[in-house]
Curated annotation (Swiss-Prot):
Main location: secreted
Native source organism of the sequence: Saussurea costus (Costus)
Cellular component terms (Gene Ontology): extracellular region
Function of the molecule: Alpha-amylase inhibitor.
Protein name listed in UniProt: Alpha-amylase inhibitor 2
Family: Belongs to the protease inhibitor I6 (cereal trypsin/alpha-amylase inhibitor) family.
Keywords attached to this entry: Alpha-amylase inhibitor, Secreted
Subcellular location: Secreted
Keyword Nucleotide-binding among record annotations: no
One of the record's GO molecular function terms: alpha-amylase inhibitor activity
Disulfide bonds: none
Length: 29
């Protein structure tokens, strides 16, 4: 899940786009 903290940490570390991940999480709810 995009909302999973581990996923957010991994993706943000990989792409540097934590804000985008958060937007995806909010948009999916």
């Amino acid at each position: 899940s995009w909302c999973d903290p581990a996923t957010i940490k991994y993706v943000s570390g990989l792409t540097g786009c934590r804000a985008m991940v958060k937007l995806e999480c909010l948009g999916s709810q």
